[in-house]
Amino acid sequence: NMLSLINKRIFFALCIALFTGCSFPSNEPKIPQNDYNQTASTNSDFSRQTSDELLDEDDDRADKEFGSFFKKYLNTRAGGDCSGFVSIVNAKYKNMYFDEKTINNYYSKGGRKSKAIYNFYESQNLITHKNPKKGDLIFFSNTLGQGIQKNKDKKNVTHVGIVTAILPDETVKFIHNSGGKIIHSYMNLKQKNTHLKGDKEINSYVVRCSNASCLAANRFAGYGKAK
């Protein structure tokens, strides 16, 4: 009936809002294993790219710049959400971050893949809060749900990206899937409450609000050291 249909649509919308940027474990993990996300089903930018095509490309990761590999994904919906995009890069570079089957053993009660990846890195003593390098993972907490307002539990990891550069002023540039689109953002831990300095972005907003607490440095949860 009509009421039942409306309730289903409301539930569907709430699922999108709650689980964007997270993923659920799969009994049959594939490479790349994109996040289970309602928006991924409408993702036309990446749907035709196969894992074989990713693995066969000739990009050299020696300098961890990732070169043109990232450029072609900017402003697309690749991966569906943040951890889905990390999985694409992980597959391309032959499990440089993790083995997908192993990650399935690290999911917490909340069921987010970004948190599962963090849990795995923490178990291997690979979480650090300083001296990032190009190619390292970068984790953020409390970007979803009730944690947005409280922002107290720094291990409530809800978002993940990849470091692409460390600038002279120690601003960290990273690439991630934010709001369903691949973008570059910035974080500077020495200027936590600064968004812009002149026309230069110092800290990007990783939560949709204009408060300084929503800037990247104030939601930072740690770096995951890459191989």
Task: State each model region's role.
Residues M2-F11:
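Bacterial N-terminal signal peptides that target proteins for export
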Residues S23-Q38, R48-L54, I148-K227:
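Aromatic- and glycine-rich peptidoglycan recognition patches
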Residues F12-G21:
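Bacterial N-terminal signal peptides
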Residues K101-H184:
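...with weaker cross-activation on analogous glycine-rich loops/strands in unrelated enzymes
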Residues F24-S108, T143, N218-K227:
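N-terminal capping segments
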Residues L18, V89-N90, G161:
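Hydrophobic, Leu/Ile/Phe/Ala-enriched alpha-helical segments that form helix-helix packing faces
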